[in-house]
Amino acid sequence: MTAPLPNRHTRTAIIDRTRVIIDYRTGSTTVLTGTALARWLDALEQSAAPAPVAVQASAISWGTSESAACLPLLPRPPWRWALAAGVLLLCTLGVRQFGSRGTRFGRLVRLAEAGRNLPPPPREQAALAVRSVRWVARFLPARVACLEESTAASLLLACRGRGGAWRHGIATDPIRLHAWICDIHARPVEEPDQTDDYTPLNTPAATAKRHR
């Protein structure tokens, strides 16, 4: 796959001697080495793209990890949270489905970052938002993965006057992507310990800093 030219929508992740390019408009991911990498770095020098992010090494897992054999029990959240989560999750799924398939990822990213300039949420509020979305998602006959779940939770927090909580990151061994919600201290909320393996690519510091 040919990588796009560096621009404000692209993120460059540094992993050893390679670079992983993620296009936040399309969700495409490209691994560059050798001559292709050299061309990318030359173009990056002249672009307004965010600076590359150094990815922390993940614990060696040989591409495997443990997970629960069944879904954990989730207590019902307060009704006003559950109702709001249901509406916003349906909105998220609608944005995902309606529109060009090639820009689906970009639409969800814009939705997830709608409240990025709001004050960050305390941990208890962020956790309630995530649990509310997960509780509602179990009743919907639709695919709700980390991107959809975290987007809906971010919207729910924005409705409560909190934002800047959505994170999207990359991990190694193997290279993989994940989206989650963080608290006021930038710690993952309602996430397994393995989420610490991911290096966020869209923190305010990472996206504000330009390569030049």
Residue ranges and their predicted role:
Residues T30-A51, P120, S132, D193-R212:
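A signal for specific C-terminal beta-sheet/loop modules enriched in small/flexible residues
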Residues R107-A137, R160-G163, R167-I184:
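Small beta-barrel nucleic-acid-binding modules, principally OB-folds
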Residues I22, E149-R212:
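Hydrophobic/aromatic-rich core segments of domains that either
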Residues P4-P6, P50-P52, P72-P78, P119-P122, ...:
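Proline-rich intrinsically disordered, low-complexity coils
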Residues M1-R116, W135-A142, C159:
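N-terminal accessory/pre-domain segments preceding catalytic cores
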